[in-house]
Amino acid sequence: MSSEKSGLPDSVPHTSPPPYNAPQPPAEPPAPPPQAAPSSHHHHHHHYHQSGTATLPRLGAGGLASSAATAQRGPSSSATLPRPPHHAPPGPAAGAPPPGCATLPRMPPDPYLQETRFEGPLPPPPPAAAAPPPPAPAQTAQAPGFVVPTHAGTVGTLPLGGYVAPGYPLQLQPCTAYVPVYPVGTPYAGGTPGGTGVTSTLPPPPQGPGLALLEPRRPPHDYMPIAVLTTICCFWPTGIIAIFKAVQVRTALARGDMVSAEIASREARNFSFISLAVGIAAMVLCTILTVVIIIAAQHHENYWDP
């Protein structure tokens, strides 16, 4: 009685999930197995292999039952699990995981999702008969000038309908158009191949303020005449320097050195203006001195008169 009350009493409600395990008697010490136990155990194991079920021990209220008690209870207190039919296990295949490892199924990759959403339904593709046949390549005479290809390389063709199914790259149709580029001042030669061209008589379009034509560079002035004139009439020291710089301008132009010619021309102009300014100032000063001397002489004569 004491062994039966080791579990939960009947008045106390069971707290374990069904099915409830009945209280089990305490485990007895196992008896030594006989000599024929391996054969019987093998036979018993073989019997369970043939039946396709496996017996698993269950926990009772008093603890883990012994192997003898489990063998006595048999199918009444055991759970059976389905097992595959008895046959020779195949050998491990090459690259297979070791036994006891679970192999997860390999899922296919996610499909490509197009982010662009179309508001309305796609237009139906036109029938194949409506598409015009590609023009046959013809050898035509090209107009004089340079030919600039608008697209380099070859690409694929665009499918009928003008749209591409999601998941595939867009392929463009090659453009075989060429834009003739004519040099400036050359009349346009058009018309049919082999015919005479039409010469354009229209005036050139007006150029904006930022499109100024490059004019030929004018040679710098040597200022030789003004240098000689200022040397004779005004101030000869700076006039001689101006004449020397004017000669340097002509020498630089003869050898094609435009930079040296511009520098010498600027110096010849400066020295010529200096000579002219000094000469004008000297003339004004001489005039003033002359007037002062004349007035002083007249005053002196009037002072000494009786």
Swiss-Prot record:
GO biological process, one term: synapse organization
Regions of compositional bias (Pro residues) in chain numbering: 15-36, 87-111, 121-137
Segments traversing the membrane: 224-244
Record's GO cellular component terms: glutamatergic synapse; membrane; postsynaptic density membrane; synaptic vesicle membrane
Residue intervals annotated with topology Cytoplasmic: 1-223
Basic residues composition-biased segments: 40-49
Record membrane topology: Single-pass type II membrane protein
Keywords: Cell membrane, Membrane, Signal-anchor, Synapse, Transmembrane, Transmembrane helix
Subcellular location: Cell membrane; Synapse
Intramembrane region coordinates: 276-296
UniProt superkingdom: Eukaryota
Broad class of where this protein is predominantly found: membrane
Region (Disordered): 1-142
GO molecular function, one term: signaling receptor regulator activity
A Pfam family recorded for this sequence: CD225
InterPro entries reported for this sequence: CD225/Dispanin, CD225/Dispanin_fam
Membrane-side (Extracellular) residue stretches: 245-275, 297-306
Family: Belongs to the CD225/Dispanin family.
Function: Required to maintain a pool of extrasynaptic AMPA-regulated glutamate receptors (AMPAR) which is necessary for synapse development and function. Regulates basal AMPAR function and synaptic transmission during development but is dispensable at mature hippocampal synapses. Plays a role in regulating basal phosphorylation levels of glutamate receptor GRIA1 and promotes GRIA1 and GRIA2 cell surface expression.
Assembly notes: Component of the outer core of AMPAR complex. AMPAR complex consists of an inner core made of 4 pore-forming GluA/GRIA proteins (GRIA1, GRIA2, GRIA3 and GRIA4) and 4 major auxiliary subunits arranged in a twofold symmetry. One of the two pairs of distinct binding sites is occupied either by CNIH2, CNIH3 or CACNG2, CACNG3. The other harbors CACNG2, CACNG3, CACNG4, CACNG8 or GSG1L. This inner core of AMPAR complex is complemented by outer core constituents binding directly to the GluA/GRIA proteins at sites distinct from the interaction sites of the inner core constituents.
Protein name: Proline-rich transmembrane protein 1
Organism: Homo sapiens (Human)
